[in-house]
Amino acid sequence: MEGGGGIPLETLKEESQSRHVLPASFEVNSLQKSNWGFLLTGLVGGTLVAVYAVATPFVTPALRKVCLPFVPATTKQIENVVKMLRCRRGSLVDIGSGDGRIVIAAAKKGFTAVGYELNPWLVWYSRYRAWREGVHGSAKFYISDLWKVTFSQYSNVVIFGVPQMMLQLEKKLERELEDDARVIACRFPFPHWTPDHVTGEGIDTVWAYDASTFRGREKRPCTSMHFQLPIQA
């Protein structure tokens, strides 16, 4: 421009371009923040998935109409169950087997024992524990809803139930079990059956019901007692 008072055109272009160029440090900081954002999102998402995977087996039973919560059996309860198995033989099933204590104890006494449990984490732990105790050949565990299992093949049935389910389970077992079967209830008795044997006190009380009794048929005599107490959980 003439007159010497203007700014050269080239200078104006350079200043305009410089306004749109961000400092290198700013770009690095933005990239780091973006990476941290993706990492944080991944961690939160992974944590939620893990919590869901772990919690679902525990929460699902609570959402059912009749739930069977996991409460580990005490050593005394296991001893009382084994007392009720004296003179008994054949297969045994634990309905809602939890961490496998009853099944493993029965397997150690010579029974072919099976546990049904809805919680897969407890089933996997029970299988590991049976292997560790050396009875994995005679102690089996399955992931299943007890209402979808038929118990007619078992001679001995053990249940740690809750009051809300005992009437319905009573009808199911009376319909499915053979006359020589025995049902052993822990913590809560069945509402209509009269127990043949009772042992223990308080939460350790165990009731034994013979199918021949609650059907009004003659019982088979006991002729032998082939194992001893005490046992350890």
From Swiss-Prot:
Ubiquitously expressed. The chain crosses the membrane at residues 38-58. GO terms for molecular function: protein-lysine N-methyltransferase activity. The gene is ATPSCKMT. Gene3D superfamilies: Vaccinia Virus protein VP39. It catalyses: L-lysyl-[protein] + 3 S-adenosyl-L-methionine = N(6),N(6),N(6)-trimethyl-L-lysyl-[protein] + 3 S-adenosyl-L-homocysteine + 3 H(+). This is ATP synthase subunit C lysine N-methyltransferase. It is an enzyme of class 2 (transferase). Mitochondrial protein-lysine N-methyltransferase that trimethylates ATP synthase subunit C, ATP5MC1 and ATP5MC2. Trimethylation is required for proper incorporation of the C subunit into the ATP synthase complex and mitochondrial respiration. Promotes chronic pain. Involved in persistent inflammatory and neuropathic pain: methyltransferase activity in the mitochondria of sensory neurons promotes chronic pain via a pathway that depends on the production of reactive oxygen species (ROS) and on the engagement of spinal cord microglia. Belongs to the ANT/ATPSC lysine N-methyltransferase family. Contains an atypical, non-cleavable mitochondrial targeting sequence responsible for its localization to mitochondria. Its EC number is 2.1.1.-. InterPro entries: FAM173A/B (IPR026170), SAM-dependent_MTases_sf (IPR029063). It is a single-pass membrane protein. It comes from the Eukaryota. The modification N-acetylmethionine is found at residue 1. Residues 56-90 are annotated as: Required for mitochondrial location.
